[in-house]
Amino acid sequence: MGGNGMDRIIDIYEMMKNVRRISFQAKSLEGSSTGWNYVGKGNVVVREEEDRLYFIEEIILDNDIRYSDRKLWEFKENYIGFYRFRNGDYEKIFEFLFCDGEFMMKKEYLCSPDLYYGEMKIWDNRICLLIKVKGEKKNEVLEYTYLT
């Protein structure tokens, strides 16, 4: 894998365009009132458009509920942008900067009254997106693991 940030971002783009599967886990932690405790697996369809990869996800949760989601990954010279699809459009949540050999969240995301924190970990054939949500009624960890 490349050593500098741009090389690493290109490597991740090449890897992510081959993602086909997802495993998902949601956990409610102490103080949460949401009851988000799910595990699921599913498939991902990836659509390429210039410096963007659109993920169309179909997940079957452990309670047999189907869950569909869409995400957008934007690959820039010095960061990877992460967007979620909400209210009919893509909304930027995080920018992950390449720093000291790993991707670091530039800043947390506020969706009042909740604050979102993100982590992105890369292994040989897996990408893990970890999102922590904290607020008055929420204390959740959402883990998306993408597999090629």
Q: What name fits each language-model region?
A:
Residues 5-145:
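Soluble ligand-binding/transfer domains with enclosed cavities or grooves
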